[in-house]
């Protein structure tokens, strides 16, 4: 497995059917964090020509799509996954052509690591020497952040700092291009509609507050150390690979189960919440384009169209031939089918202590500067997700 340095610094093991690298060796970065250098253009060009990407959060929705994209473009892709008692690599297992016999010439490698462990991050950066870093790892569930605020800050805020500082400590500040997955939750209690790169932030959750620190520390390293460090302020983006606890996937999974007679109804929170939903596959293309631009900058990535959770439900149930009729208000609101069977209920337990009522992005800057524009519509997205979940639930009702 490639590590970018000596073979002796890499120890590998096979876990399940995936080979994971445990990187050792910190010497290259000791005492370097305060040195300043100007990298010659030829050296910089040769470094970047290697096309080596490091992805944190590679086992998630975005990480898996991004890995596919980068591999298709000829990159060597390294991903960081956390060691745990259970496997969470289902979204990326297909990227291994022959995982058991997979050796050093592979284009795809996984490494154990954690955003709370700075020494581990320094070792990985030192050994891999990535040309591009895509920082997607986070505790990204807004409601969970109210239950785990300190952990959310440790991973989402300080974790971003640790990764940036690992690059700086290894004297790769002027060579590595860094992408930080920022979020539309920064806008929270929105100050204008739609939201652009110039809209003031007003975070409304521990998650959003932690991500705001992440946003500004990226800007700080860009300005302080001349690092090619960028924020992608991504509005909600979904896919069949979306985590099961997020509202869109919760809806499409439940609709699939209902269509197969495995479930009767679904409980949700704020049905009136308005969101700008896009497809994750398109959004990772924007991430890549951000790092190919001539200069580092921050970009809103969004569709510019808005739907409520209620409308998302309507679209999902329409895919199984059911038209919902809505009755009541607030926690008393229900959605019934034509036979009067309640399909959607509202439960107070899914409300957040501070709600974000509306998010709508203005991605004109990305369109003009990067040539990026969302193409998949919400009805198309819902159709794909419901169809995928029906296939999943047919084969494995307990999934």
UniProtKB/Swiss-Prot annotation:
It catalyses: GDP-alpha-D-mannose = GDP-4-dehydro-alpha-D-rhamnose + H2O. One of its GO terms (biological process) is 'de novo' GDP-L-fucose biosynthetic process. Its EC number is 4.2.1.47. Pathway: Nucleotide-sugar biosynthesis; GDP-L-fucose biosynthesis via de novo pathway; GDP-L-fucose from GDP-alpha-D-mannose: step 1/2. GO terms for cellular component: endoplasmic reticulum; sarcomere; striated muscle dense body. NADP(+) binds at residues 57-62, 114-115, 136-140, 151, 211, 237, 242. Keywords: Insecticide resistance, Lyase, NADP. The keyword Lyase applies. One of its GO terms (molecular function) is GDP-mannose 4,6-dehydratase activity. Catalyzes the conversion of GDP-D-mannose to GDP-4-dehydro-6-deoxy-D-mannose. Involved in susceptibility to pore-forming crystal toxins in conjunction with bre-2, bre-3, bre-4, and bre-5. Involved in susceptibility to the nematotoxic C.cinerea galectin Cgl2, likely by contributing to the synthesis of N-glycans to which Cgl2 binds. Has a role in determining brood size. Belongs to the NAD(P)-dependent epimerase/dehydratase family. GDP-mannose 4,6-dehydratase subfamily. This is GDP-mannose 4,6 dehydratase 1. The lineage of its organism: Eukaryota, Metazoa, Ecdysozoa, Nematoda, Chromadorea. The gene is bre-1.
């Amino acid at each position: 497995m490639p590590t970018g340095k000596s073979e002796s610094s890499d120890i590998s093991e096979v876990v399940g059917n995936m080979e994971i690298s445990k990187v050792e060796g910190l010497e290259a970065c000791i005492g370097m964090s305060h040195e300043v250098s100007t990298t010659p253009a030829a050296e910089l060009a040769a470094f970047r020509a290697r096309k080596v990407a490091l992805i944190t959060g590679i086992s998630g929705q975005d990480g898996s799509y991004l890995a596919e994209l980068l591999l298709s473009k000829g990159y060597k892709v390294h991903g960081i996954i956390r060691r745990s008692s259970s496997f969470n690599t289902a979204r990326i297992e297909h990227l291994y052509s022959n995982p058991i016999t997979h050796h050093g010439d592979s284009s795809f490698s996984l490494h154990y690591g954690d955003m709370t462990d700075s020494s581990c991050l320094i070792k990985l950066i030192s050994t891999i020497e990535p040309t591009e870093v895509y920082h997607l790892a986070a505790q990204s569930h807004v409601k969970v952040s109210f239950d785990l605020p300190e952990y959310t800050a440790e991973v989402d805020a300080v974790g971003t700092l640790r990764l940036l500082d690992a690059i700086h400590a290894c004297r790769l500040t002027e060579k590595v291009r860094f992408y930080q997955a920022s979020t539309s939750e920064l806008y929270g209690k929105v100050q204008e509609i739609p939201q652009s790169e110039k809209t003031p932030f007003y975070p409304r959750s521990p998650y959003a507050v932690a991500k705001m620190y992440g946003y500004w520390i990226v800007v700080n390293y860009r300005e302080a150390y001349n690092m090619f460090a960028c924020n992608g302020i991504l509005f909600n983006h979904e896919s069949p690979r979306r985590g099961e606890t997020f509202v869109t996937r919760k809806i499409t999974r439940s609709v699939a189960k209902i269509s197969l007679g495995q479930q009767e109804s679904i409980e949700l929170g704020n049905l009136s919440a308005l969101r700008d939903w896009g497809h994750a596959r398109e959004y990772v293309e924007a991430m890549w384009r951000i790092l190919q631009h001539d200069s580092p900058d921050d970009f809103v990535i969004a569709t510019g169209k808005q739907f409520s959770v209620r409308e998302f439900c309507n679209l999902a149930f329409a895919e199984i031939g059911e038209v919902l009729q809505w009755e009541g208000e607030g926690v008393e609101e229900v959605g019934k089918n034509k036979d009067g069977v309640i399909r959607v209920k509202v439960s107070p337990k899914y409300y957040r202590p501070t709600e974000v009522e509306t998010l709508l992005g203005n991605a004109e800057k990305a369109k003009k500067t990067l040539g990026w524009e969302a193409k998949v519509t919400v009805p198309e997205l819902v159709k794909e997700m419901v169809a995928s979940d029906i296939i999943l639930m047919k084969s494995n009702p307990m999934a």
